């Protein structure tokens, strides 16, 4: 009996210790996050995070879905949400391009908290004569209207072989799903896609099969060209996705999606407590979807990424010995690049206030190229 009391006491003591450790994480009791729409692959991930915070820390999270980058970022800018689950718009916004080249936007001083590793590549049917990126010359390559996230990645990958949209037959589609279906029906020869994304599994399962065009890490010259267009992409070996496995891997473009994003003025302690809470809740959500394991801390941090990493994240990573000198160097250079754009934008606004919206955007994009010339590889 005495032994039983001792065991119960120890269990209670350990439980209290755990609660005390949990109490050291200071989070608001309610949070609102902007996310991709309900049908997206990232919405269930945001939902899993929210459930974990509720179970572990009694934090109620409301998700605010939107199908557009502006719709996800504007609430963050207006401080109606505390965190935005973004895609490549975190890069576009920090750079002041595409939708964010307008005079009411411009470069945004964003910071990344966490970002899941992902890959992107160009897929072709396996029964074609397209084996490498250079073989795309003269072929029909999908271009999706109003989807710069996909299009700029395809453009960057084509630069691997010194190709541009002028060297291929740009085949325009109204939506990404339509372009993937067209690949299956033979109406287009190549599509940029995520290996674990919608549609590509159907192609892999068909008689045509699927082939991913290799992007060898050893081709540093080609990677430099690519990173001049999208500096957040890096070489990555992919084993997960349509037609892929550990025994049939391919080197693709690594990037991060979704990126949990805030503005730079978000407090260090707020971000520190959030990332710590997510890290300590990993066991609760790691099996929710096939890719959730990639939110493990040592995978979901690091560089390169779409925008500089927040100082609160860096503080926690240093405690976990997950922040390297290379990461520090990259982050400092990325902040320098962003500050160059922020300063340049303010000067540009003062000088060009009377321009029409169309001329304003066009002239800003020219100015941006000049500002960033010193960062080209």
Residue ranges, per PLM feature:
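Positively charged n-region of N-terminal signal peptides that target proteins for export
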Residues: 1-4
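Bacterial N-terminal signal peptides
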Residues: 7-15
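Sec/Tat signal peptide C-region and signal peptidase I cleavage site
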Residues: 17-21
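Bilobed "Venus flytrap"/periplasmic-binding protein-like clamshell domains
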Residues: 26-56, 60-62, 119-185, 196-198, ...
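An extracytoplasmic/periplasmic, membrane-proximal ligand-sensing/linker region
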Residues: 28, 195-208, 212, 269-271, ...
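Pocket-flanking alpha-helical
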Residues: 45-52, 62-104, 122, 130, ...
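Pocket-lining segment of extracytoplasmic ligand-binding domains
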Residues: 88-90, 98-100, 128, 165-167, ...
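Ligand-binding clefts/hinges and TM-proximal coupling segments of bilobed small-molecule sensing domains
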Residues: 140-156, 232-301, 305
């Amino acid at each position: 009996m005495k032994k039983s009391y001792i065991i119960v006491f120890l269990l209670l003591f350990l439980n209290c210790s755990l609660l005390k450790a949990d109490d050291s994480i200071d989070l608001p009791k309610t949070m609102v996050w902007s996310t991709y729409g309900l049908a997206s692959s990232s919405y269930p991930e945001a939902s899993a995070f929210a459930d974990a915070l509720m179970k572990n820390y009694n934090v109620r999270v409301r998700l605010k879905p939107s199908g557009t980058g502006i719709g996800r970022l504007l609430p963050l800018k207006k401080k109606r949400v505390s965190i935005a689950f973004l895609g490549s718009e975190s890069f576009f916004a920090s750079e002041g391009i595409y939708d964010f080249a307008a005079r009411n936007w411009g470069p945004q001083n964003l910071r990344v908290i966490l970002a899941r590793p992902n890959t992107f590549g160009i897929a072709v049917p396996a029964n074609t004569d397209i084996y490498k990126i250079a073989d795309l010359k003269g072929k029909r390559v999908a271009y999706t209207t109003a989807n710069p996230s996909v299009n700029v990645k395809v453009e960057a990958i084509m630069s691997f072989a010194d190709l541009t949209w002028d060297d291929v037959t740009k085949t325009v589609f109204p939506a990404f799903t339509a372009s993937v279906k067209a690949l299956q029906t033979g109406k287009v020869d190549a599509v940029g896609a995520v290996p674990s994304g919608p549609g590509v599994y159907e192609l892999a399962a068909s008689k045509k099969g699927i082939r991913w065009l290799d992007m060898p890490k050893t081709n540093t010259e080609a990677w430099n060209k690519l990173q001049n267009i999208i500096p957040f992409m890096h070489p990555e070996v992919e084993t997960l996705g349509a037609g892929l496995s550990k025994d049939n891997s391919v080197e693709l473009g690594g990037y991060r999606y979704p990126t949990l994003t805030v503005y730079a003025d978000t407090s260090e302690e707020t971000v520190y407590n959030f990332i710590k809470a997510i890290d300590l809740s990993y066991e609760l959500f790691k099996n929710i979807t096939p890719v959730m394991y990639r939110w493990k801390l040592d995978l979901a941090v690091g560089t390169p990424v779409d925008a500089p990493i927040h100082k609160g994240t860096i503080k926690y990573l240093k405690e976990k010995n997950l922040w390297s000198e290379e990461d520090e160097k990259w982050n400092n250079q990325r902040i320098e690049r962003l500050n160059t754009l922020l300063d340049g934008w303010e000067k540009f606004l003062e000088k060009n206030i009377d321009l029409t919206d169309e001329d304003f955007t066009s002239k800003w994009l020219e100015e941006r190229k000049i500002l960033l010339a010193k960062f080209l590889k």
